[in-house]
């Protein structure tokens, strides 16, 4: 099922939570809505679900305008962060609940509901636990039950609101891989909300980066990480460092000296240079480079993060070195960014 969000604005008591947002989601696609708190990602998910109505604009499921339809009429499956399982029901009854409460001819026979629950238990790798209650399950198992319940109604669209947010890091990593496998097997159009960029980049076919009620960028993990289109995206996705620079005659200058980077197509004047801490070339001398005094150095897993003070204004940047690299022992380090991007000064 294709989903199209067309020029949607959402206000809460005149406070704009979304500003004229448009987004096309392809049938069978796994989409991540990624952003900090207050970015509008959960509001957008709830609008797609039918839990909220747009102040302006429309939401289409296929060619049909679903803007004023309820969540039941849209036939979406919704998975909450905190599972929302019924404590007094067994696993099998929780999974079959959405089918049991259907009315009239749309309600399957009890035998069909049991068959569907058993089939989904196999899919989510919980066979043999159908008679247990939620309190007898781990957090990861409860989230699998919640996903199976959402899929039981054979939804047109599957929506997940920070589905792994309440779980510890190891379980989250395992469930991410599992969810991707489930999606590839079932082919549901799936949209999930997360503030965890690693989760979004690993899982999604495309990532929608949001900030302050607007979409900043939509693209694959490679697009978002390697070619961010705004200072916000560059700073929000992955680790980054930045320096105020200026462009003169197609060359990038830091303070009163060129740093060996050419920008022939960049506009002249003040700009901000962004680069990744791990993507730098270390240099012995500094004829056309960036040099700084080591202000701090710390071990981060298999690397060493070095904080440098640059220039008279003591602008600070971070670079990343292998743990045993001799440059980490120096008081002064010279480098040049490998991949980088310029944005006009704010």
UniProtKB/Swiss-Prot annotation:
* SUPFAM superfamilies the UniProt entry points to: MOP-like, P-loop containing nucleoside triphosphate hydrolases
Q: What is this protein called?
A: Sulfate/thiosulfate import ATP-binding protein CysA
Q: GO cellular component terms?
A: ATP-binding cassette (ABC) transporter complex
Question: What is the membrane topology here?
Answer: Peripheral membrane protein
In the Enzyme Commission scheme, what number(s) does this protein have? 7.3.2.3
Q: Where does ATP bind?
A: 35-42
Q: Tell me what gene encodes this.
A: cysA
Q: Which PANTHER family match?
A: SPERMIDINE/PUTRESCINE IMPORT ATP-BINDING PROTEIN POTA, SPERMIDINE_PUTRESCINE IMPORT ATP-BINDING PROTEIN POTA
Q: Which UniProt keywords apply?
A: ATP-binding, Cell inner membrane, Cell membrane, Membrane, Nucleotide-binding, Sulfate transport, Translocase, Transport
Per the database record, which ranges form the ABC transporter domain? 3-237
- For this protein, what reaction is catalysed? sulfate(out) + ATP + H2O = sulfate(in) + ADP + phosphate + H(+); thiosulfate(out) + ATP + H2O = thiosulfate(in) + ADP + phosphate + H(+)
Function recorded in the entry? Part of the ABC transporter complex CysAWTP involved in sulfate/thiosulfate import. Responsible for energy coupling to the transport system.
């Amino acid at each position: 099922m294709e989903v199209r969000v067309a020029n949607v604005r959402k206000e809460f008591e005149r406070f704009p939570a979304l500003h004229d947002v448009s987004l096309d989601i392809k049938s069978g696609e796994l989409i991540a809505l990624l952003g900090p708190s207050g970015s509008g990602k959960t509001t957008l998910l709830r609008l797609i679900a039918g839990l909220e109505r747009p102040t302006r604009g429309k939401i289409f499921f296929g060619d049909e305008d679903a803007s004023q339809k309820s969540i039941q009429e849209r036939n979406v499956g919704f998975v909450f962060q905190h599972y929302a399982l019924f404590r007094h029901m067994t696993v099998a009854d929780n999974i079959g609940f959405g089918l049991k409460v259907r009315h009239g001819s749309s309600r399957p026979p009890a035998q069909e509901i049991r068959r569907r629950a058993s089939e989904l238990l196999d899919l989510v790798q919980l066979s043999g636990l159908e008679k247990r209650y939620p309190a007898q399950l781990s957090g990861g198992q409860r989230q699998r039950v919640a996903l199976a319940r959402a899929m039981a109604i054979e939804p047109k669209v599957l929506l997940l609101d920070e589905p792994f947010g309440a779980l510890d890091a190891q379980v989250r990593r395992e469930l991410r891989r599992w969810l991707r496998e489930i999606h590839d097997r079932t082919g549901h159009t799936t949209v999930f909300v997360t503030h965890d960029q690693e989760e979004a980049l690993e899982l999604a076919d495309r990532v929608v980066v949001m900030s302050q009620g607007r979409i900043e960028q939509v693209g694959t993990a490679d697009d978002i990480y390697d070619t961010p289109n705004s200072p916000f995206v560059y700073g929000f996705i992955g680790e980054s460092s930045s320096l105020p620079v200026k462009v003169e005659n197609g060359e990038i200058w830091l303070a009163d000296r060129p740093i060996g980077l050419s920008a022939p197509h960049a506009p002249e004047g003040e700009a901000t240079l962004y680069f990744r801490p791990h993507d730098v070339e270390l240099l012995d001398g500094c004829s056309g480079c960036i040099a700084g005094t080591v202000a701090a150095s710390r071990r981060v897993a298999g690397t060493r993060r070095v904080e440098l003070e640059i220039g008279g204004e003591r602008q600070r940047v971070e670079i990343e070195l292998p743990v045993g690299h001799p440059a980490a022992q120096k008081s002064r380090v010279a480098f040049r960014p490998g991949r980088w991007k310029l944005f006009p000064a704010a």
